[in-house]
């Protein structure tokens, strides 16, 4: 566990990069940390450290969700670099769920692509409240029609955002080149391309408000990963959804199996020890007397009695169209997809409500769901509906039945 204390001096915001594969999300993440490091606000992370899951570099696509931290003059950011490839939408869902806002990266050379649309939709469904746009690869546009191209892409992006109920007309859009900015920062001086990155971060500072932290609500953290620390016990990691967790607190582990009670013996963030983790923090929580095998991804850590496991609920869902990457055909009563809740997939069967014969791609309907395993649920819990690894719908729990 960590030894250094984490100091809270600036407001803390969770942010991330989203967008189509190879439009430059990871390069931008590296450029932001590099430029801010030269500006004196941040320690440097190199590109490979961000693109750090072993399977990534063979295929040149980012698979795992990487976390980096950086600071602007006014804020501390935890930044997730979200996977861009459609195969990895599952990670996109866990990653995007950790954002107070997102930077949508679009190559000015291509304009919005299939996954640009998919990520905007997913951002809407998983509750990413604000998007700032970076038009990347400006250096690759021809000088004579550069202005025109940028204007065209900008118009297209604003329309696309509005289509998914984001305020397209008011969204900040900054053009630049992440690659050129990164090259500049490597020399230790900031030039015109770095200035674009600073402009982007100013837009992020101003446009993405400090989230209303849900610190006063009952503690809940979705468990993403589980480790054993020799001689100390079991550590569970995840993002604190709401409330706070402090050393000495009694907590429950809810979902999938019988509810277990335990006590928190340590909390850490970015390898630094803390007394408490609060809503919005990505942290590790050390729990007493619980075997690693007794905990799995998809369970939640929570204040005792605050949330209970359920298998049956009513939900409001949106079914993706074929164009959005969804089903090509309708589904009927007793349809059995996977329901992706917080950090895990659980199979469930769908009961259509009276008067509904079938559900077409593009429909927005109320359905009843029965899961094969209990999950910690309450009204307002969001989920994705998936089939064979691809997202075919999204929904929110409107009523608990059992």
Curated annotation (Swiss-Prot):
Which Pfam family is an annotated match for this chain, by its short name? GTP_EFTU_D2
The UniProt keyword set, sorted, is: Cytoplasm, Elongation factor, GTP-binding, Hydrolase, Magnesium, Metal-binding, Nucleotide-binding, Protein biosynthesis
Q: What is its main location?
A: cytoplasm
**Where is the protein localized?**
Cytoplasm
Positions bound to Mg(2+):
26
Q: Name one GO molecular function term.
A: GTPase activity
Where is the stretch described as G1? 19-26
G2, as annotated region: 60-64
What residues does the tr-type G domain cover?
10-212
Region (G3) residue spans: 81-84
Which residues are noted in the entry as GTP-binding? 19-26, 81-85, 136-139
User: According to its UniProt record, which protein family does this protein belong to?
Assistant: Belongs to the TRAFAC class translation factor GTPase superfamily. Classic translation factor GTPase family. EF-Tu/EF-1A subfamily.
Q: How does it assemble?
A: Monomer.
Task of the protein: GTP hydrolase that promotes the GTP-dependent binding of aminoacyl-tRNA to the A-site of ribosomes during protein biosynthesis.
Q: What NCBIfam families does its record include?
A: EF-Tu (TIGR00485), PRK00049.1 (NF000766), PRK12735.1 (NF009372), PRK12736.1 (NF009373), small_GTP (TIGR00231)
Protein name, please? Answer: Elongation factor Tu
């Amino acid at each position: 566990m960590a030894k250094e204390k984490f100091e809270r001096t600036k407001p803390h915001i969770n942010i991330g990069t989203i967008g189509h594969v190879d439009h430059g999300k990871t390069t931008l993440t590296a450029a932001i940390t590099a430029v801010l490091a030269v500006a004196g606000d941040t320690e440097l992370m190199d590109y490979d450290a961000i693109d750090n899951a072993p399977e990534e570099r063979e295929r040149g696509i980012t698979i795992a969700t990487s976390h980096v931290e950086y600071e602007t003059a006014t804020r501390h950011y935890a930044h997730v670099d979200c996977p861009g490839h459609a195969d990895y939408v599952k990670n996109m869902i866990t990653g995007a769920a950790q954002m107070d806002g997102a930077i949508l990266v679009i190559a000015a050379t291509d304009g919005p692509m299939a996954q640009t649309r998919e990520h905007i939709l997913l951002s809407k469904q998983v509750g990413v409240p604000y998007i700032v746009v970076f038009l990347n690869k400006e250096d690759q546009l021809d000088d004579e029609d550069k202005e025109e191209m940028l204007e065209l892409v900008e118009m297209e992006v604003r329309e696309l955002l509005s289509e998914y109920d984001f305020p397209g007309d008011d969204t900040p859009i900054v053009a630049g080149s992440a690659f050129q900015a990164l090259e500049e920062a490597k020399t230790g001086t900031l030039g015109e391309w770095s200035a674009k990155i600073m402009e982007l971060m100013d837009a992020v500072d101003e446009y993405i408000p400090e989230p209303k932290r849900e610190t006063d609500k009952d503690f809940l953290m979705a468990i993403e990963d589980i480790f054993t620390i020799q001689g100390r016990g079991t550590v569970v990691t995840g993002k604190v959804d709401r409330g706070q967790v402090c050393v000495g607190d009694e907590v429950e582990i809810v979902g999938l199996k019988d509810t277990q009670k335990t006590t928190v013996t340590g909390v850490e963030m970015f390898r630094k020890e803390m007394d408490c983790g609060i809503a919005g923090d990505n942290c590790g929580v050390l729990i007493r007397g619980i075997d690693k095998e007794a905990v799995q991804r998809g369970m939640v850590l929570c204040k005792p009695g605050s949330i209970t496991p359920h298998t049956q609920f009513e939900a409001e869902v949106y079914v993706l169209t074929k164009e959005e990457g969804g089903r090509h055909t309708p589904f009927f009563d007793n349809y059995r997809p996977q329901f992706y809740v917080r950090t895990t997939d659980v199979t469930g069967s769908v009961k259509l409500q009276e008067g509904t014969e079938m559900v077409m791609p593009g429909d927005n309907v109320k359905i009843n769901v029965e899961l094969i395993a209990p999950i910690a649920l309450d009204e307002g819990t969001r989920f994705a509906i998936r089939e064979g690894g691809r997202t075919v719908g999204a929904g929110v729990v409107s009523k608990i039945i059992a």
